[in-house]
């Protein structure tokens, strides 16, 4: 892994300004946010089914968000992109390559057992589609595959505070939850870690004002992140995924269905030129 975040492709190319998506022509901002939560949950469930480490799952989630920050949902079916991101992340994070059979079986099982209310049909893709989708994902990211996460700085901060046993479990869960937002595309990981730690301190009623005051960090940025986290929890508690997702998915702009045979088509059945959308 690259040793310096500030010189890494993560910082130089993938800390993005927030932009409206083309998909907001079809979906409200709230519906788009719910779609992002849904597919983050799919990636999480798939990673857990495959017994992947949380960092692998987090990296897969970042890949997914990077792709759809630059391309419409219409370009490649997110149901295909989700396992593709897991497949690539498992290799990049040196977990080991997930076998073709295991990946397809796990995706089919997770969609059928955990998300049948939103995806009643069989998983329509095979490994050749995932491998082709991986090519487009790599092309978009220009092979910039190293992802920095808030977990390591969070651990260092909590140890520095001397509150590891009290604060780390809650702050870690909050970091996991931030992947259901776009924070990983908008802010450096150390800032996300500090924001999650701040929320954990408030919840656990730990006075850390002096510790935060001594940091050389833009606290306005930290407060921006905290507001996003609090908004996530406020909206999340009112989100009935089982009731709402089928309708939202039906409004999502759709790519063409997968081809019946291999050829010069992309993984969603469209010609390669359809991947030039921005």
UniProtKB/Swiss-Prot annotation:
Disulfide bonds: none annotated. Residues 267-278 have a biased composition (Polar residues). Component of the Mediator complex, which is composed of MED1, MED4, MED6, MED7, MED8, MED9, MED10, MED11, MED12, MED13, MED13L, MED14, MED15, MED16, MED17, MED18, MED19, MED20, MED21, MED22, MED23, MED24, MED25, MED26, MED27, MED29, MED30, MED31, CCNC, CDK8 and CDC2L6/CDK11. The MED12, MED13, CCNC and CDK8 subunits form a distinct module termed the CDK8 module. Mediator containing the CDK8 module is less active than Mediator lacking this module in supporting transcriptional activation. InterPro entries: Cyclin-like_dom, Cyclin-like_sf, Cyclin/Ssn8, Cyclin_C_2, Cyclin_N. Signal peptide: none annotated. Residues 247-278 are annotated as: Disordered. The modification Phosphoserine is found at residue 270. This is Cyclin-C. Its main location: nucleus. The keyword Lipid metabolism does not apply. Belongs to the cyclin family. Cyclin C subfamily. PANTHER family: CYCLIN. GO terms for cellular component: CKM complex; cyclin-dependent protein kinase holoenzyme complex; mediator complex; nucleus; ubiquitin ligase complex. Component of the Mediator complex, a coactivator involved in regulated gene transcription of nearly all RNA polymerase II-dependent genes. Mediator functions as a bridge to convey information from gene-specific regulatory proteins to the basal RNA polymerase II transcription machinery. Mediator is recruited to promoters by direct interactions with regulatory proteins and serves as a scaffold for the assembly of a functional preinitiation complex with RNA polymerase II and the general transcription factors. Keywords: Activator, Cyclin, Nucleus, Phosphoprotein, Repressor, Transcription, Transcription regulation. Coiled coil: none annotated. Gene3D superfamilies: Cyclin-like. It holds the Pfam family Cyclin_N. Residues 41-139 form the Cyclin N-terminal domain. The gene is Ccnc. It is found in: Nucleus.
């Amino acid at each position: 892994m690259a040793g310096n975040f500030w010189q890494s492709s993560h910082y130089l190319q993938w800390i993005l300004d927030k932009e409206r998506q083309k998909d907001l022509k079809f979906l409200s901002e709230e519906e788009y946010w719910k779609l992002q939560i849904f597919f983050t949950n799919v990636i999480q469930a798939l990673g857990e089914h495959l017994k992947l480490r949380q960092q692998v799952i987090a990296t897969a989630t970042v890949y997914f968000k990077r792709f759809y920050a630059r391309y419409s949902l219409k370009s490649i079916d997110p149901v295909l992109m989700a396992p593709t991101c897991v497949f690539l992340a498992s290799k990049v994070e040196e977990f080991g390559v997930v076998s073709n059979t295991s990946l397809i079986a796990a995706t089919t099982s997770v969609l059928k057992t955990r998300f049948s209310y939103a995806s009643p049909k069989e998983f329509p893709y095979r490994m050749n589609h995932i491998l082709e989708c991986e090519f487009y994902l790599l092309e978009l990211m220009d092979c910039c595959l190293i992802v920095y996460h808030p977990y390591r700085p969070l651990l260092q901060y909590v140890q520095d505070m001397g509150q590891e046993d009290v604060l780390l479990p809650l702050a870690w869960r909050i970091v996991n939850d931030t992947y259901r937002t776009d924070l990983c595309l908008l802010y450096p990981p150390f800032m996300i870690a500090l924001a999650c730690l701040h929320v954990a301190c408030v919840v656990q009623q730990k006075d850390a004002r002096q510790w935060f005051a001594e940091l050389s960090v833009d606290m306005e940025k930290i407060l921006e992140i905290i507001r996003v986290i609090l908004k996530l929890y406020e909206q999340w508690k009112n989100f009935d995924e089982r009731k709402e997702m089928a309708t939202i998915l039906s409004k999502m702009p759709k790519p063409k269905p997968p081809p019946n045979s291999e050829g010069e088509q992309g993984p969603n059945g469209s010609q390669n030129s359809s991947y030039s959308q921005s």
